[in-house]
From Swiss-Prot:
Gene3D superfamilies to which the protein is assigned, alphabetical: Exonuclease VII, small subunit
Gene Ontology CC entries for this record: cytosol; exodeoxyribonuclease VII complex
Enzyme Commission number(s) from the entry: 3.1.11.6
Compartmental location: Cytoplasm
Top EC class, one word: hydrolase
Function text: Bidirectionally degrades single-stranded DNA into large acid-insoluble oligonucleotides, which are then degraded further into small acid-soluble oligonucleotides.
Similarity-based family: Belongs to the XseB family.
Oligomeric and partner information: Heterooligomer composed of large and small subunits.
Single GO molecular function: exodeoxyribonuclease VII activity
Biological process terms in GO annotation: DNA catabolic process
Designated name of the protein: Exodeoxyribonuclease 7 small subunit
Keywords: Cytoplasm, Exonuclease, Hydrolase, Nuclease
Known catalytic reactions: Exonucleolytic cleavage in either 5'- to 3'- or 3'- to 5'-direction to yield nucleoside 5'-phosphates
């Protein structure tokens, strides 16, 4: 599954698996580097997903506050 089609939860699960593999002392240096690189890409993708979600939540809160303010001004 590519990172473009993975959900946030799937990316986090893959990150956890990568950490477990990296903790295994039998992993070769080359494989460790590959795992680290993949982990960094997943971490960046998760960060972007979280920032986008945070922006959406903040936008919704702002929109709701504006609606409440408009409702209050029409009541007066």
């Amino acid at each position: 599954m590519t990172k473009e089609t993975q959900s946030f939860e799937e990316m986090m699960q893959e990150l956890e698996q990568i950490v477990q593999k990296l903790d295994n002392e039998t992993v070769s240096l080359e494989e460790s580097l590959d795992l680290y690189q993949r982990g960094m890409k997943l971490s960046a993708a998760c960060d972007t997903t979280l920032k986008n979600a945070e922006k959406k939540v903040n936008d919704l809160i702002k929109e709701e506050a504006e609606d409440v303010k408009n409702d209050e001004s029409t009541d007066e």
